[in-house]
Structures are given as structure tokens and as C-alpha cells.
Amino acid sequence: MSRTLYDKLWDDHVVYSEEDGTATIYIDRQLLHEVTSPQAFEGLNLAGRPVWRISANLAVSDHNVPTTDRSEGIADPISKLQVDTLDQNCDAFGITQYKMNDTRQGIVHVIGPEQGATLPGMTVVCGDSHTSTHGAFGALAFGIGTSEVEHVLATQTLLMKKSKNMLVRVDGRLQPGSTAKDIVLAVIGKIGTAGGTGYTIEFAGEAIRNLSMEGRMTLCNMAIEAGARAGLVAVDETTIEYIQGRPYSPKGPAMLQALQYWRTLHTDADAKFDAVVELRAEEIAPQVTWGTSPEMVLAISERIPDPEKERDPNKRSAMERALEYMNLTPNTPLSSITIDKVFIGSCTNSRIEDIRAAAKVVDRLGKKVAPNVKLALVVPGSGLVKAQAEREGLDRIFKAAGFEWREPGCSMCLAMNADRLEPGERCASTSNRNFEGRQGNGGRTHLVSPAMAAAAAIEGHFVDVRKIS
């Protein structure tokens, strides 16, 4: 019987199935951070339970850590408590953790793949929505709640039901200036934020095969924003090349054995999907979100839509509310929208490829951050990404242009640390969510690629990076 990649991953991890379709699934890797783990560890302590498989867990503080000088510690008492609690719990249970001043510290969805802790064929969970990132490796990866974090710590299993299969095929070749971020925003714009509900999405096609692992991680990271349970990309030589030699990856005979299995992790030629979505890569322009949902997105060459032209009353109402919150007028060209702050970072776009792309634009433009831009942040996804960028001199390019070069962490992706928007401020952000208040109460978020964010910082408004010679 022919199977999809998702079918194979599911079948390989079912421990027991109920008649109603509920299955006990074995979990290979759990990633932990300071926000969703304290109550899980407390549950273990209250019940007197040990961690079932200590080596299957890897922890890091990322959401609440400061991205400025860390020698003073964490100023906010709640943030400090969460970080200290993770430190204490990991020490008590013997779980490997990259603490705040460890050079390997960073955003959980950056450090997992970077360390080789995410491998093809694995089930990977974390108490974080964007765990879908790890599906780029042909792994079944998804976010879970705190009670489920405790359940995995205690049993290494989860109860769940199988999703349906969706194929998103992107054939053709991307135009110069368009990126993986633009692909996934275009997909969400096409199917909506509920389009993937009940599905696991597999991304395939020529354009996907031509992406680096960093690009594939960006795609899968935002599968959740399309409503999907998880995102997947089949294993190929790009995957294997990325994994080899990393600290957690297999070595010697174990690697040879792993490769035999990994090379089976693709959808069979005649396997059937429950839904298929197709896009042409050459038609995907650089994207900019204009509203308060990732599905409210358009090509940079377009104008803010007019709610009066929307026939569906519910959609029209949502558009009107979004435009009011974003303080935008229908028919305004996206390229004329001025911005107050720029954020280059997050688990979506903070890897070395992203930093290079942004630095290339800054270097090519050869100017400083625009006077109307109050703050332009570059926040590498990990200490190792930061060190690599500094070896390449990328930090000097940013600092010379007036950007701030920060320490790794989640930073301005969400208003949970010192990096945030003030009410009414407008931000060009490489993160994944543009909900009301996501980056700070009253803050207005536009999601873009690293290149688009860098160009907006220099010009003071959105520009089409395809026109930057």
C-alpha cells in the first residue's frame, strides 16, 4: 500500500490504537523552554515521578532572556523566575540545558536542528506552537500544551488522533528577491489561516527542493499559521548534508544505518492526499502582511484592499477591524507605508542564511537606517549563529548602518521580554504572527522576509527588494 511521508512517520510511532482512532504515539525528542515547562515539572514533583527518558529531552531559555548585555542578569522578576526555575528543574532531573550564558543558547527551534537533536524520522514535541519548524527534516513535529509536556516527561508518549494529508506543491523557480518566507506567506494568503485545519502539510515541488534547510525550516515553521498540525519536507541529500557532523547526529556505523532509513522518508509515487494546493514559484513576489492575521497578505506591488469590495459580511467586518487597528487606508500602496521599527530575528528567520540575506541588502544599499526608523534590531537565533555572523563580518555591516546587534533570544517576536513595540508603533518584522498586540500592546506588525525588513529599515518604508540592483 502506497503511503505519504506523514503516513510513514505516523505508522512508525504508533504504540497502540483505540477503535475510535485515538493512538498512543511514541515521542523521540522533547524540547523544553522556560515558559511552558514549570507546571509540567511541578506535576512530576507532586506525583513523585521521574523523567522517563532523560536523554530524550533538551532545554534552553529563550522567550524571556534579555538580548542586551546579560552581565546584569534579568531585570523583570517574572522573567527571572521562569528562567531560574528551568535551570533548577533541569539540574534536579539531569536534563541537558543550554543556560543563558552558554554559547549554544538560543531559540529552541534554532538550537535543536543546529545541534543535530532534530533528526529525520523522529517525532519531536515542544510546548510551543512553532515546533512544526522541525518538520523540515522529515520529522513529525508539533506543539503541545503544558499538561502534555508533563505526560511526555513521565511516559515518553502522547495520545492523539491522526491528521489528514495535504500536499502543497510549489513548482518552478523563485525570482531573485523572493524567499521561503514569501512562499509560505503566499500559501497562507491562498488557503487562509484555517485552510490547513485538521491536516499535516507536506511541502513539495521543484521550488521546495531548491531551498536550503534554513528555507525549509521557515516554511514548516509557519505551517501552523495555516492552521495545520504540522509541516513536512521529505528527506534528500540537502537534509543529510546539513545533519552530518553535528553533536547529536549519529556517527560511524550508526550513521550508515540511519541513512538507510532516512532515505525511505518520502511520499510514495502513487500515494493519495486528501487535499492538494498548487502554486507557481515564479509568480510569488515578495510578500507583506497588511492586517492582523497572516492571511491578510499581498505582494509588495499591490495596494491595501478595500473592504467595500468584499461580498462576505464576516470577511468585510474583519478587514474593517484590521484596517482600523493597523491605521491603514484602503487603496494605499504597500510601498508607501512608513515604519517605526524593524525586527530581524525569531524562530522563523534568525539563522545564518537569514542574517546573510539581510546584511547583503544593507551592504548593497550602502546607507544608514532611515531617520524615521527609531530602532532596527538584528537578533541572531543562537550564540553559534551570532558567532558565525561575526566571523563573516556581518555584524559590522549592520552596526555601521545603525542597526543594533543583539544577543540571541525570541526578542521582539512576542511581548514577553524587554524588546517590544509601544502603542501605535509600526514594525517590519521577520517573525510569524501579526496578531493585535503580539509585539506589544497597540503595536502594528507587518510580516516580511529578512531582505524586505532590511530594505525597509534603510529606506524607511517598504520597498520591492527585486528592484535593488
Curated annotation (Swiss-Prot):
According to the record's subunit comment, the protein's assembly and interactions are: Heterodimer of LeuC and LeuD.
What is the name attached to this protein's record?
3-isopropylmalate dehydratase large subunit
Please describe what this protein does: Catalyzes the isomerization between 2-isopropylmalate and 3-isopropylmalate, via the formation of 2-isopropylmaleate.
Q: How is the cofactor bound?
A: Binds 1 [4Fe-4S] cluster per subunit.
Pathway the protein contributes to: Amino-acid biosynthesis; L-leucine biosynthesis; L-leucine from 3-methyl-2-oxobutanoate: step 2/4
The first-level EC class reads lyase
Reaction(s) this enzyme catalyzes, per UniProt: (2R,3S)-3-isopropylmalate = (2S)-2-isopropylmalate
User: Under which EC number(s) is this enzyme classified?
Assistant: 4.2.1.33
Under the heading Pfam families, the entry gives:
Aconitase (PF00330)
Cofactor(s), by name: [4Fe-4S] cluster
A single Gene Ontology biological process assigned to it is: L-leucine biosynthetic process
InterPro entries from the UniProt entry: 3-IsopropMal_deHydase_lsu, Acnase/IPM_dHydase_lsu_aba_1/3, Acoase/IPM_deHydtase_lsu_aba, Aconitase_4Fe-4S_BS, Aconitase_4Fe-4S_dom, IPM_dehydratase_rel_enz, IPMI_cat
Q: Which organism is it from?
A: Polynucleobacter asymbioticus (strain DSM 18221 / CIP 109841 / QLW-P1DMWA-1) (Polynucleobacter necessarius subsp. asymbioticus)
Keyword annotations for this protein, in alphabetical order, are: 4Fe-4S, Amino-acid biosynthesis, Branched-chain amino acid biosynthesis, Iron, Iron-sulfur, Leucine biosynthesis, Lyase, Metal-binding
UniProt xrefs under SUPFAM superfamilies: Aconitase iron-sulfur domain
Renumbered to this chain, the signal peptide range is: none
Residues involved in [4Fe-4S] cluster binding: 347, 410, 413
Q: Name one GO molecular function term.
A: 4 iron, 4 sulfur cluster binding
Similarity remark: Belongs to the aconitase/IPM isomerase family. LeuC type 1 subfamily.
